[in-house]
Design a protein with these regions (language model features):
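Surface-exposed repetitive/solenoidal architectures
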Residues: 1-33, 41-44, 52
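Feature responds to low-complexity, polar/acidic, surface-exposed segments characteristic
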Residues: 31-69, 76-96, 102-131, 144-156, ...
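C-terminal/domain-terminus segments
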Residues: 158-165
Length: 172
């Protein structure tokens, strides 16, 4: 078991959002560290009780500890890979990627994802592909500006940010 996998072991439930895959533990021991794409989808797969999934065809996922979670998330439309056919599971997740994944997950769960916030007051804007997801995440108060005028959508999401965002997301 590698360190990321052991960090995600836990008994989390939706009623105990900080314990989803030990999200609180992630924030407690290294709040400024980044969170990987694999860790995020693994947390969501734990919420869903996913035990198996068909191969989604990512060249870099095969039989790793996160393979079932990534394959499930791709198969149900929660995540997409990169143009080169990879998922890049060990890449730090950005704030806009997290917003997109959570919006897709909310849609998968049948939630209303139509809310949109005006992001024009922020000096840095999300990538075109992530614009609606960031508008939704800000409207739902899941993601807030890092400062009053900086949203920093392309910045890596710290473990502390991820824990707070997941707590707000699961509380809805």
């Amino acid at each position: 078991m590698n360190s990321e996998e052991s960090e995600l072991k836990g008994t989390g439930t939706a009623e105990d959002p900080y314990q989803i895959g030990s999200a609180a533990a992630l924030a407690e021991f290294a709040p400024e560290a980044t969170t990987t794409r694999a860790m995020i989808v693994s947390m969501l797969a734990r919420l869903e009780g996913v035990e198996s999934a068909n191969n989604a065809g990512f060249a870099d996922v095969s039989n790793e500890w996160y393979a079932t979670a990534v394959n499930w998330a791709a198969n149900v439309g929660v995540v997409n890979g990169y143009e080169d056919g990879t998922f890049q599971p060990n890449t730090a997740i950005t704030r806009e990627q997290l917003a997109a994944i959570l919006m897709n997950y909310a849609a998968y769960k049948g939630e209303d994802v139509s809310a949109r916030a005006d992001l024009s007051s922020y000096t840095n804007q999300p990538s075109t592909w992530a614009e609606e997801a960031m508008q939704w995440a800000v409207a739902e108060e899941l993601i807030t500006g890092v400062t009053n005028d900086e949203l920093q959508p392309q910045s890596s999401a710290t473990r502390a940010q991820v824990a707070a965002i997941l707590q707000r997301f699961l509380a809805e």
